[in-house]
Design a protein with these regions (language model features):
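A generic structural motif
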Residues: 5, 31-42
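Ser/Thr/Gly-rich low-complexity blocks that favor extended beta-strand/coil architectures
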Residues: 10-35
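Short, surface-exposed beta-strand/loop "edge" segments at domain boundaries and coil↔beta transitions
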Residues: 10-11, 43-47
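Generic "edge-of-domain/loop-turn" microfeature
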Residues: 24, 31, 42-44, 81, ...
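Beta-propeller and closely related beta-pinwheel folds
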Residues: 47-219
């Protein structure tokens, strides 16, 4: 998956970028807008150009924080440089994240935008695509998910730990996740009456049991 920008390329030595849609591999950087590269695909010309894009994931930019499969798409959540971004692959083609022209089966990329920081800490495929961030829990809907139908809505404001990864788990149809506070475990459950998710504190009557959990499992 690719992100187009005019960002500095000083940390991109060894990375592949695209110039006018053609691949080159950066071998040296001499300035914020100047680099030497090995041509991997024949270029249309040799003139300077601002038409370039860089891989969203690399040693320079960071790697996906979390992943899951949902509706025949691979879902990647967050990275070091793009902590609130979601990427969904092409339907049925888990390695193709190209958004193309926005056709129903093509790749999808979007950011969680709100009034607070939302670094993605987990994604989970349940009744809907669920996204767990450092500050809230979200529901991604669309039947099926397409670039035109996708909708994103914040459900609750509990938050997940930022200093360690604790993947959420399915427990009898509900999603259980560790709270950012380190003193609670919540059940993220959908209610038909409210047509929304609720986060119920499962440690409410035994707070002393939960102290900075590091992993969860359910059998």
């Amino acid at each position: 998956c690719l992100v187009g920008s005019e960002m500095c390329i000083r940390d991109s030595v060894g990375a592949e970028i695209r110039l006018a849609g053609k691949r080159v591999q950066v071998t040296a950087v001499s300035g914020p807008r100047n680099a030497t590269a090995t041509v991997l695909d024949a270029l249309p010309g040799t003139d300077a150009t601002g038409d370039w894009d860089e891989s969203a994931f690399s040693a320079a930019r960071g790697w996906p924080v979390t992943a899951c499969f949902h509706q025949a798409r691979l879902v990647l959540g967050g990275s070091r440089d793009l902590p609130n971004q979601l990427w969904l692959s092409r339907s049925g083609d888990l390695g193709d994240f190209d958004p193309g022209t926005g056709l129903d089966d093509e790749g999808i990329a979007f950011a969680l935008m709100s009034d607070q920081v939302n670094a993605i800490r987990g994604v989970f495929s349940g009744r809907h695509l669920q996204v767990f961030t450092s500050g809230a829990e979200w529901m991604v809907t669309g039947d099926p998910l397409t670039p035109a139908s996708i909708q994103l809505s914040r459900q609750t404001r509990i938050g997940s730990p930022v200093d360690r990864m604790i993947p959420p788990v399915d427990v009898d149809g509900s999603t259980v996740f560790a709270a950012r506070s380190g003193r609670a475990v919540h059940e993220f459950a959908y209610t038909d009456v409210a047509d929304a998710y609720q986060s119920n504190d499962l440690a409410l009557v035994a707070r002393h049991i939960v102290v900075q959990p590091v992993s969860m499992a359910y059998d």
